[in-house]
């Protein structure tokens, strides 16, 4: 007779807290723009050194103000740390796609999260589509 097996409780997986170049998200949110710029990738750093346009500034004001429904066409805007946890609707050329920002999306462009093209799914050929389909019996 075998001894009963001991069942071990499985510990839930602990997700490591996200850091960006050694800084936690809370630390990034507390930093000013002048402190964030050296941490950004080169393309984003160049954009912020040139300055934000009026539309980008108003988008940041809406986010800081706590508006619940934010819609934007600004696909070239960069995800700032204060956008983390917020949901923004981004226009993809046809419709607004709702995007919830995770910590991993810091300093990416908004346009990366609302794709403008769909994958093509071709259907089967219909009646009259090809010469061979002329002889398909109709139901």
From Swiss-Prot:
Signal peptide range in chain numbering: none
Family membership: Belongs to the universal ribosomal protein uS19 family.
Record-linked PANTHER family: RIBOSOMAL PROTEIN S19P FAMILY MEMBER, SMALL RIBOSOMAL SUBUNIT PROTEIN US19
Highest taxon in the source lineage: Archaea
Protein name from the UniProt record: Small ribosomal subunit protein uS19
GO aspect biological process, one term: ribosomal small subunit assembly
GO CC annotation terms, alphabetical: cytosolic small ribosomal subunit
Species per Swiss-Prot/TrEMBL record: Methanoregula boonei (strain DSM 21154 / JCM 14090 / 6A8)
SUPFAM superfamilies noted in UniProt: Ribosomal protein S19
Keyword Transport attributed: no
GO molecular function, one term: rRNA binding
Annotated function: Protein S19 forms a complex with S13 that binds strongly to the 16S ribosomal RNA.
């Amino acid at each position: 007779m075998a001894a009963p097996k001991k069942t071990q409780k499985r510990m839930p997986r602990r997700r490591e807290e996200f850091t960006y170049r050694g800084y936690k998200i809370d630390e990034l949110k507390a930093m000013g723009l002048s402190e964030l710029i050296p941490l950004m990738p080169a393309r984003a750093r160049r954009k912020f050194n040139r300055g934000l346009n009026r539309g980008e500034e108003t988008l940041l004001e809406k986010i800081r103000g706590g508006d619940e429904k934010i819609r934007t066409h600004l696909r070239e805007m960069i995800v700032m740390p204060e956008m983390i946890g917020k949901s923004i609707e981004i226009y993809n050329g046809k419709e607004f796609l709702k995007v919830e920002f995770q910590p991993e999306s810091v300093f990416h462009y908004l346009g990366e999260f609302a794709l403008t093209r769909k994958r093509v799914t071709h259907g089967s050929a219909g009646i009259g589509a090809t010469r061979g389909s002329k002889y398909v019996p109709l139901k």
